Amino acid sequence: MSVSCELREWRGAGSGSAADAEGYAWEGDAVVWRGGFEQIHVNVARFSTDDFNPFHDPGKWRRIAGNPFAGPLVLGFQCEALIENLIAHLPNHPEDEAFAAEQGLAWTHYEFTFVSPLLPGERFAARARAGRRQQAPTPSIAYRILVRTVDRPVLTGFVRRTAESLNALTLADSAFARPLSEAPDRLSRGGWFLKRKFASTGHAKNFLASALANPADWFDELEGRVNFPDLFPPALLSCALLEQAQASGHDFFKAPLVYAAHRIGVQGPAVRALRSNEPIHLLVRTPEPVADKGGWPVARLSSLALVYAGREDRLLAQAEVQLAPLAAWPPPGSD
């Protein structure tokens, strides 16, 4: 969240609104991006994160049993990365960063609900409201966000920055122990699965570009700037979940699952300290039914996850990923 975006403003005659050269418009206390993803953006997103979900494949989506969608889908993490970049374009972003540094707000919590799918070529608007800072009872900054097409919401939620994590999940809750680098890749143990990836500025740049962000805001070799975005390491969890499911014999075509919600806590300074070729250890728990259906006709599934980095196992992120069977689509209240 500490990325520096220098906005290049223009003012339309009599419009009273400001926008930068990349299409981000300031409207009141909000920043809005209007446009659309194309299949090339989806391909870059899935290739940069090794996401092989057939829902995003321009050919395999047709083989999914009972698929009601008219084409491949934009990745959930792709939309979320757009939101992260959107917040960095808020006009009061420098003041938020100063407050966060003063109050030691090291954690950023992304809580998103997936309301409806977004397809390549669909026009949409992504909006983030100015952050609300508060000192009591504990210091924090909160942002409300919304992604919607002209006729339906796509993603809703909020982003909150705090000094401490809001998630109690630790390595001790998993079936693994330090040092994680000694465990082999793709190891299943006690209902948990370890997937190892490696940090790559090239992959992170491509991921940002797939999310309609300018990678130069985050990385510049000539200026010595290396800032991995918060959501790049968690975006690799999709690959870990897919490989875990594949190892257990799950059939992605006959029993398709869709994202219902993401709850992701990111320790920003630890992510910003990432460097190329550092190992990233992704731990995901086998999805389990959620007791509260939340109005869904069938139980959702919840997978807990942890993301660590380096040989010293620095904690980058904690997450809960909720999924739902495609047969339960659409979710309640999506009309």
What are these regions (language model features)?
Residues 1-33, 111-189, 268-335:
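HotDog/MaoC-like acyl-thioester-processing domains
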Residues 103-116, 264:
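A cross-kingdom feature marking solvent-exposed beta-strand/loop segments within repeated
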